[in-house]
Amino acid sequence: MKSFRLTISLLFITIFAHAQAPATIATKNPFPTISTLSNWASYNSQEKFNIDVRSLGFKFEEKSVEAASTAYTYIRKVTVDNINYTDRIVYRIANDNSASIISLVTASTDLVSFFTPQLTGYKTGKCDNEMSKDKKTTCTCYDNGKFVIDVCDERVKLTMGDGNNYFISVAKK
């Protein structure tokens, strides 16, 4: 009977110790795929984009109206390796709803490594964006006939040391 009680006690201790163990950190990448970004660039509708981007944890930050287009900026705060980052995604749409561009900027995740394998079927071309003119920035530009995609890695000085900002832009042709 003593061994039975001991066995039951050990069983309960094991169950309760396991139940109180810290939850494992999710390894799912919270960034949209190239396919998703391309779909968003095809929407030509901020309302549809707004619903989709919020599902990834982004919150609306600001609206910027310009002569030919309107930009909607969304941000999300993330912590990676105990360092706080702000991810930013901008949805720019022509005022006549004829075209839209998605831009994503982050320092929290290496977007070049994340997106490059997804772009194997795209043709690489000459980059003609503002970031590609900066000596501290490396850009690779892709084209599949329907979309133009720029992926950039910018070397930056941070208070805690050197780092990188990553940028991707998807525009429908």
Report each predicted region and the residues it spans.
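Bacterial Sec-dependent N-terminal signal peptides
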Residues: 1-25
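Sec-dependent signal peptide cleavage junction
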Residues: 18-55, 167-173
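Accessory recognition modules or surfaces
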Residues: 20-40, 62-93, 143-147
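Core segments of cupin and vicinal oxygen chelate
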Residues: 49-75, 125, 137
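Exposed acidic/polar residues on beta-strands and adjacent loops within beta-sheet cores, strongest
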Residues: 62-69, 129-132, 161-173
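Secondary-structure transition/turn motif
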Residues: 76-79, 103-109, 143-145, 163-173
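Long, charged/polar, surface-exposed segments that mediate recognition or autoinhibition
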Residues: 83-141
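Short, exposed beta-strand-loop hairpins at the edges of beta-sheets
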Residues: 142-163
